[in-house]
Amino acid sequence: MAQQTFTGRKRVRKFFGHIKEVAEMPNLIEVQKASYDQFLMVDEPTGGRPDEGLQAVFRSVFPISDFSGTSMLEFVRYEFEPPKYDVDECRQRGMTFAAPLKVTLRLIVFDIDEETGAKSVKDIKEQDVYMGDIPLMTMNGTFIVNGTERVIVSQMHRSPGVFFDHDKGKTHSSGKLLFAARVIPYRGSWLDIEFDAKDIVFARIDRRRKIPVTSLMFALGLDGEQILSTFYKKLIYKRIKEGWRVPFDANRFRGYSTVNDLIDADTGKVVLEAGKKLTVRTARQLQEKGLKALRMSDEELLGNYIAEDLVNPKTGEIYAEAGEEITDKLFKVLNEQGYKDLPLLDIDHVNVGPYIRNTLSADKNMTREDALFDIYRVMRPGEPPTLDSAQAMFQSLFFDAERYDLSAVGRVKMNMRLELDAPDTQRTLRKEDILAVIKTLVDLRDGKGEIDDIDHLGNRRVRSVGELMENQYRIGLLRMERAIKERMSSVDIDTVMPQDLINAKPAAAAVREFFGSSQLSQFMDQTNPLSEITHKRRLSALGPGGLTRERAGFEVRDVHPTHYGRICPIETPEGPNIGLINSLATFARVNKYGFVETPYRKVRDGRVTDEVVYLSAMEEGRYRVAQANVPLDAKGRFTEDLVVCRHAGEVVPMTPDKVDYMDVSPKQLVSVAAALIPFLENDDANRALMGSNMQRQAVPLVRAEAPFVGTGMEGVVARDSGAAIAARRSGVVDQIDATRVVIRATEDLDPTKSGVDIYRLMKFQRSNQSTCINQRPLVKVGDIVKKGDIIADGPSTDLGELALGRNVLVAFMPWNGYNFEDSILLSERIVKEDVFTSIHIEEFEVMARDTKLGPEEITRDIPNVSEEALKNLDEAGIVYIGAEVRAGDILVGKITPKGESPMTPEEKLLRAIFGEKASDVRDTSLRVPPGVQGTIVEVRVFNRHGVDKDERALAIEREEIERLAKDRDDEQAILDRNVYSRLADMLDGRQGISGPKGFKKDTKITRAVLDEYPKSQWWLFASANDKLMAEIEAMRKQYDESKKGLEQRFLDKVEKLQRGDELPPGVMKMVKVFVAVKRKIQPGDKMAGRHGNKGVVSKIVPIEDMPFLEDGTHADIVLNPLGVPSRMNVGQILETHLGWACAGLGKRIAQTVDAYLSKQDVKPLKETLKRIYGEDETIKSLNDNELLELGHNLSRGVPIATPVFDGAKEADIEEMLKLAGMDASGQSTVYDGRTGDPFDRKVTVGYIYMLKLHHLVDDKIHARSIGPYSLVTQQPLGGKAQFGGQRFGEMEVWALEAYGAAYTLQEMLTVKSDDVAGRTKVYEAIVRGDDTFEAGIPESFNVLVKEMRSLGLNVDLHNSKLGPAPTSEAAE
């Protein structure tokens, strides 16, 4: 699996996977990008946009007509204007990265003929209207909102459609199953149809009061007889001599208990004696023998139901209504009237129950009007119904496209479930749909069919960014529609333009609200590249229209068989959100209906092909799917007789010819984070969950190092997350420095585009989590790169591979109790060599506002501050870049005017003599908060429009303009070089018919001739070849345009820089200061491996005290072996052994590299590499210099890839250990660093990839001397953010009581907490140097007294000796 890429040649991973991967892994952030592109459709031509996304929203809301119908506002098209600021400018200025939306609307005014009412068009006006800004997505699938990066998480919700379910016997004490159906639209009213305990069928609309389902059918326009004929077959019983001739049907009579003998109506023979039960088998035998009909007596027909009204044709008298039960009385009438045929309903109480018939007879409503009134009263209680209003309301509930939308998904699901064939453009319900739902529900009650599993992924779908945004924008437009309608009626429609009717605020507000405060719009987790990718691939069941934590039961959270290959069964948070927030599996994608699909290889006649098909959960249920690790022969046929397959949620062995599909890869069932854990298959699931979650918390280290033991996914993550920069086009590196890479393109040379790609690198930027984003180039000038090659590493990436931690030498052994309970013992080398050192960038900002008493000022001139404290500030009062600051230092000097206090005459005199002194301002400077110390890396100054810039702001601006000018000049130089070299190639060797001054006509143009003239004059040369001249002319035109474009872009950017900034109201100036903090690892920091093996650093030990190996190498980390057996994450042990082998092989390679350097012989290096890698294509293609560089890169350790579920086996690890010349047990003799004696037993030693997590002790440790108090109780606040105190709770009080420490206890509950007067006295006593104090009444006691008084209980305090004690009021 060698990648022939620029970085792939510098470090080759040995690949242990056996299964070839056929499917390309989709781009990992495609979910976000594709969805939003489909919503905006920026690149689609404005005329031919399909009806989806934003286009669909406008189409659904427009046209808008006024109330009288005299005018109409139509939507024509929309387009986006270019965004005002680019991504980086938005980040810096705290703006939203958005593009203005311009919509073309057409206002049509009609003339209405008063007599005929005919409409004719009187006037048409078209105009472009601004409809607010729509946020744009960045290249990496995020949004910049108010300067911060946010991610819109996709939401899992119940798919629209129809669902059948039962109450699992919980409602009724007998445990009887009550079935229910629910029709869920995308938007609109829900319709529930349910059975009650008496088997009557009811309907509910929007969870309101229930009504009999027959009332709903009446409202749909059916009458009683039609209802019965819809749900029941009609049987005609004929009158014969001894009774009735009844048609015989085996299915209908199975399970029939006979009262009298069963007699064949045609022959008169007895076919079954009385008192016996007709079994299914007997019934079938009778039918096969030719039994056509049975003879039954009158009494055997009692209890059946009439199928249609029995009416006397002459008089019109009704003897019996449809659905009436047959009684003796009715028989008398029938016999009197001489009925020969009797139509009965086919209800046998076994296969067909009388539920609808019973509901009909229980229903009080008899007509459509009654039913409509009843529904109206349920929906709008308290309003008197009229027939029109009731009809209109019922119509609008389910049949009006404006209010009810099943969506294409809902329609498709409904068609599948009910076996209908309505087109997916039919978005409202139809009469047939409702009847089909009731029919299916009744069938379920009769024991036919299955209920739905609502946790099946075929019944849950994903709403991605585009769709969430679409719904939000629709809400905004609907709010706008009301306002437009009212305005159309109130203005003179003939004189207005569309612009005057529209106020875009509601639409813009809906968008802003969604991005700013929706539960699904989240602050991006930017700790490292993996956490970014995982955040974008997250699926949440929470959010508006989703579940809530409290209500979600166990079933929703559980892993479902349909999750296979779609949703990761491992990666989900621990705690209350477990199972509600999931991650998309590696190969999964979301289809156009919002269902998650996973790829499979097609199997034809027992042979696996390379054709890849994506299937959703519903489709997959129909097929048999084999695992990816089933053994195949060279032709792709199954080698085993039985293949284990998944089919309809079960695992069954099948013969190869029955298999339909096969998995594409073993890692398709896990998410990206879980696929990064080597030997995942050897870890317990709970620990794998912790492992995949903790990788997302790994802090980017100062020196990233890719893992020795990887899984082959590292490169994919680094590339797709956008942390590492990939080349957009193939080309040659032209220029390079720390902040940018300039590549001259050699492919995709479009004459309309620049031939130069400039890649700007991010240097020491702050991420959302305050970690450091820093990119560094990997290429040198003159390197040839292909499209897609990695040219720069980002945070946590190393040679284009994800590198979250470091490879460290670990020994598994106890060490003086310092690794008790998962603690971690570290060597001092780790601190000294900055192995786990990370840089964190803190941002501090200060604003100078305009206050009532005058403007605040940012200045160096601060009252009562020593010159020493100002040493880091420049003349503008802002700290220098590069200054070292610590807690309490001033970053930005600021003074605020304070209110005039009355002055004494002496003060007035002094004031008059010495002029205005600083007594009327107070110091409100920005200082470094406690616990922070570091170096200033960046300062940004923002000024309001029209406010004069200070010296510092001007200096920053000058620097920025210089940078822009350099970019422009470089691009210009490369452009010139490119164009003039192409021009010289074109002219070289041609016959010149004219040229610049001094050129002789008809002379041959050569390079030498060209060099005599300045390049700008080369355009004057002309040749007789017209085609050539046309090409040159086109090139010149393109060149001039490019030049102009470059200059224009430069001027635009400079203009933006010099223009003032948009600051919040009342703010005159804002300064942001960025402090870089270097955090070395220290006791209290949390570390973890990739297998959920986490712990806290307990002690850092001098190198010489650490256990060491026979060759004198000291261990870097000592872990407790007891952390492995009970946790069952054996993967870490296998990783240790394999890492040990990698390091050993690295040493071997280092020796051969040294041999090459001393003897110039490359053979030993080639042979060693061949022994390790076998026949590797990449290594074969390298020249000697490249081999040497590869050797250098491999000398610390040979990186290997062991993919999940398809990785190295035990035998492979032993073989690697042998190859490295190590003991195959993976254990070594270890010596005690303090005594030098060997330990009794051999110890497992090897390399593990350890991460430093974001839970750093520096961020958590905190101490308070004095600080803020809570307003009511006057107790200190809590928490580091509030600079709070430590809570002395109930149990701590018990502890002091138990020890009888009365005075300590009193002090804790009074002066150290909320005895206001006592606190002040203690302070005064300390100032005097006195150490006595007296405790008073705690403020919380006064609060209690007040509460009791509010309940009407007066409380007075009395001191037993001195009478009433003063309470707080008395004191006041």
From Swiss-Prot:
CDD domains: RNA_pol_B_RPB2
Gene3D superfamilies, per the entry: 2.40.50.100, 2.40.50.150, 3.90.1100.10, DNA-directed RNA polymerase, beta subunit, external 1 domain, DNA-directed RNA polymerase, subunit 2, domain 6, RNA polymerase alpha subunit dimerisation domain, RNA polymerase Rpb2, domain 2
GO MF, any single term: DNA-directed RNA polymerase activity
Pfam families the record matches: RNA_pol_Rpb2_1 (PF04563), RNA_pol_Rpb2_2 (PF04561), RNA_pol_Rpb2_3 (PF04565), RNA_pol_Rpb2_45 (PF10385), RNA_pol_Rpb2_6 (PF00562), RNA_pol_Rpb2_7 (PF04560)
Keyword vocabulary terms for this entry: DNA-directed RNA polymerase, Nucleotidyltransferase, Transcription, Transferase
InterPro entries, A to Z: DNA-dir_RNA_pol_bsu_ext_1_sf, DNA-dir_RNA_pol_bsu_external_1, DNA-dir_RNA_pol_su2, DNA-dir_RNAP_su2_dom, DNA-dir_RNAP_su2_hyb_sf, RNA_pol_bsu_bac, RNA_pol_bsu_CS, RNA_pol_bsu_protrusion
GO BP term, example: DNA-templated transcription
Catalytic activity: RNA(n) + a ribonucleoside 5'-triphosphate = RNA(n+1) + diphosphate
Enzyme Commission (EC) number: 2.7.7.6
Enzyme class: transferase
GO cellular component, one term: DNA-directed RNA polymerase complex
Main function: DNA-dependent RNA polymerase catalyzes the transcription of DNA into RNA using the four ribonucleoside triphosphates as substrates.
Quaternary data: The RNAP catalytic core consists of 2 alpha, 1 beta, 1 beta' and 1 omega subunit. When a sigma factor is associated with the core the holoenzyme is formed, which can initiate transcription.
Family (UniProt): Belongs to the RNA polymerase beta chain family.
Name recorded for this polypeptide: DNA-directed RNA polymerase subunit beta
Lineage: Bacteria, Pseudomonadati, Pseudomonadota, Alphaproteobacteria, Hyphomicrobiales
GN (gene name): rpoB
